[in-house]
Amino acid sequence: MLTLTRIHTVSYEVRSTFLFISVLEFAVGFLTNAFVFLVNFWDVVKRQPLSNSDCVLLCLSISRLFLHGLLFLSAIQLTHFQKLSEPLNHSYQAINMLWMIANQANLWLAACLSLLYCSKLIRFSHTFLICLASWVSRKISQMLLGIILCSCICTVLCVWCFFSRPHFTVTTVLFMNNNTRLNWQIKDLNLFYSFLFCYLWSVPPFLLFLVSSGMLTVSLGRHMRTMKVYTRDSRDPSLEAHIKALKSLVSFFCFFVISSCAAFISVPLLILWRDKIGVMVCVGIMAACPSGHAAVLISGNAKLRRAVTTILLWAQSSLKVRADHKADSRTLC
């Protein structure tokens, strides 16, 4: 493929700023998702039964940790190892492919969470839908194991296919001025094909997520109309559960669309135009989205909120004890 590539130089200040933002995003994302993981995993250690939603959140936090780690490695590769004038190296392409697989697993887990909310909150009247909701509630652990197994198989197959495929590059250089050259790079097409394949396989879970979220929205509308007719109590547990579930699902939808658009835009920026600054902006957006949704999940989950309150109270008491200890030592002096 013949592409006209303009080489954009990136200053040291821009690379340092991007790396600092990447470290900050990685730290925030790692802490929020590790917190969700540890709170739920601690119940497993204590042999306390996990609810279906907690199991999904546990798997979701693990996939997000992988996402943040891969995006941080991508940022390091982009700033220090990937040169603009050269084709994409193997390690950078492998990191991007693994991110696509982790992102697809993240979408499947969100679809499972949406189905679980539907089975728990919607009051079905049709016999088939009642049986389907009961089946989803009973088979959620098997669904999670299937998602993990499929993600592992896809990872092994994609990595094996990528590294077993012959890689070659034909580059024709035609200097038109000081910073423009004409490159024919066949090697970079591997990343484009892998990106397209992963996005096509993301269509079924995305449609499943949209359908289940739409059903939950319709159920909320019906419930609100019923409340207006039969009751005047504004604090209804079912209504609050509907609203919390929709907040987490709508926030995931917004963050996923933003992250997917950034990933989609980054491909031509990287392969065709070699615009490293544009790719840096896209990677920064992609890293911020999982952290934002993790914060929404923490704010909407009672167990996670209690854990946050406990940690804050412990930190406050520790600071107070230290302050009292310093005051006592000064008094003795």
Curated annotation (Swiss-Prot):
InterPro entries from the xrefs? TAS2R (IPR007960), TAS2R38 (IPR030050)
- Signal peptide start-end: none
The membrane-topology field of this record reads: Multi-pass membrane protein
Q: Please give the GO cellular component terms listed in this UniProt entry.
A: plasma membrane
Concerning its family, UniProt says: Belongs to the G-protein coupled receptor T2R family.
Could you tell me what this protein does?
Receptor that may play a role in the perception of bitterness and is gustducin-linked. May play a role in sensing the chemical composition of the gastrointestinal content. The activity of this receptor may stimulate alpha gustducin, mediate PLC-beta-2 activation and lead to the gating of TRPM5.
Alphabetical list of PANTHER family matching this protein: TASTE RECEPTOR TYPE 2 (PTHR11394), TASTE RECEPTOR TYPE 2 MEMBER 38 (PTHR11394:SF52)
What is the protein name stated in its UniProt record?
Taste receptor type 2 member 38
Source organism of this protein record: Pan paniscus (Pygmy chimpanzee)
